[in-house]
């Protein structure tokens, strides 16, 4: 569900009202005071139950023609038939999210009751099957990062959210840059995890709300 052409300001006569996508707020937070500070071009991806994202181009939040730029629902694979929460099939979110990790675990273990906790704990303890499941999930993330890097040529991709703490950023960065450098003269991009992203995002939404959702920094 969503709102279009709704006058939120009419709900409050005393305070100015600003409405913005939370992932866009997070992307701007990282750009202003977080892991991608000082980098004019960056992509922020939140890995949680779902996947969110925001794109900074030339120091401006890029929103696209309808405000939907940065939604991580681009199609990953043909005919895999994994249904996404958006209703489509085989979106990046359906593979790269925590929900996607569970689904990958179900498929590889043949256990419908497996949880993300089971997989991460097993991987950390050296269980081979759980490690294989986790690595498969991480490679789904990698495929998305390679595509985004080819499209936007960012200085950095920042991963945040509850699942980001478990990924191997050195592996993701190395493999992403191997793919793009062998096919072009692009400079390498960095991949970072911001484990303090939630507190940073809250601060930026509170302190820089006017700058964030006004016309000052928007494209």
Protein language model annotation of sequence segments:
Residues 1-41, 168-178, 183:
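Glycine-rich phosphate-binding loop and adjoining helix at the ATP-binding site
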Residues 92-95, 102-170, 188-197:
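Adenine-nucleotide phosphate-binding core of ATP-dependent small-molecule kinases
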Residues 13-20, 116, 169-203, 210-219:
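Conserved phosphate-binding/catalytic loops in two-lobed NTP-binding clefts
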Residues 37-95:
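Glycine-rich phosphate-binding loop of actin/hexokinase-like ATP-binding domains
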Residues 28-33, 135-149, 177, 206:
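Generic structural signal for well-ordered alpha-helical scaffold segments
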Residues 13-23, 77-112:
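Glycine-rich phosphate-binding loop plus the immediately following alpha-helix
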